[in-house]
């Protein structure tokens, strides 16, 4: 899939919607993607002394503070998704309806990004200026634009990790996996983690479990943020 995406972006391969829909492209469970609490703290809170990398750091921090939101979901958030202090949206991958309370720290970061972003006349609906194509991944141009944005973010994230001297590899998946691992380490029920991430299922028995309220999921999110922010390095 990665090779195909590069080919489409370079114009060497035709764009075929949902080409890998019936092909398993999941992650090997043996491949560790989550950062330790110490490295995650450094990634999100140490000063990279670079405006370019600071913007990347803010985006990464928002992904973590939005309950491990994927880069695709963050990039495609529309302004209408922000309803006062709650984000309401459908996941790009599964179309699962999601709601995330925007913590005060996240609100400050959103304002930081807004203060430095230029208005995009052709696409005024996105919450952030990560994308500007108004087709929302429904055509080849939008698909290429998103793949390019994802590649650029991952490259800058690697630069950020290198500047902060992290030993572990990082990518856009790192924030999502790290949020889930932090919650698991803190004893949060797997059902709560799954629902907060917007996963469709973990076990058949989960169908019979009561859903968690937004207030409960917000407390889990606040706990994760507090744990990482206050983590004491060596």
Predicted features along the sequence, with ranges:
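Basic, Lys/Arg- and aromatic-enriched nucleic-acid-binding interface segment
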Residues: 14-71, 75
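Short, basic (Lys/Arg/His-rich) helix/loop patches that form interaction surfaces
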Residues: 49-50, 145, 154-195
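Conserved tyrosine-mediated DNA breakage-rejoining catalytic core shared by Y-recombinases
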Residues: 21-22, 76-112
């Amino acid at each position: 899939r990665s090779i195909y995406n590069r080919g489409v972006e370079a114009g060497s391969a035709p764009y075929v919607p949902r080409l890998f829909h019936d092909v398993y492209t999941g992650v090997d469970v043996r491949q560790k993607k989550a950062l330790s609490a110490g490295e995650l703290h450094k990634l999100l809170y140490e000063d990279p002394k670079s405006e370019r990398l600071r913007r990347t750091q803010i985006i990464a921090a928002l992904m973590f503070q939005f309950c491990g939101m994927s880069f695709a979901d963050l990039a495609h958030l529309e302004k209408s998704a922000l309803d006062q202090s709650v984000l309401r949206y459908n996941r790009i991958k599964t179309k699962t309806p999601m709601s995330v309370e925007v913590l005060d720290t996240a609100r400050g970061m959103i304002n930081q990004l807004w203060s430095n972003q230029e208005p995009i006349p052709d696409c005024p609906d996105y919450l952030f200026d990560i994308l500007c194509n108004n087709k929302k991944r429904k055509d080849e141009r939008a698909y290429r634009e998103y793949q390019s944005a994802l590649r650029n973010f991952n490259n800058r994230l690697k630069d950020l990790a290198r500047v902060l001297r992290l030993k572990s590899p990082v990518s856009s998946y790192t924030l999502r996996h790290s949020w889930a691992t932090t919650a698991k380490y803190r004893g949060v029920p797997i059902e709560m983690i799954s629902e907060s991430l917007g996963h469709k299922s973990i076990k058949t028995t989960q169908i019979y479990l009561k859903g968690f309220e937004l207030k409960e999921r917000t407390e889990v999110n606040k706990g994760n943020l507090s744990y990482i922010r206050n983590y004491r390095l060596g």
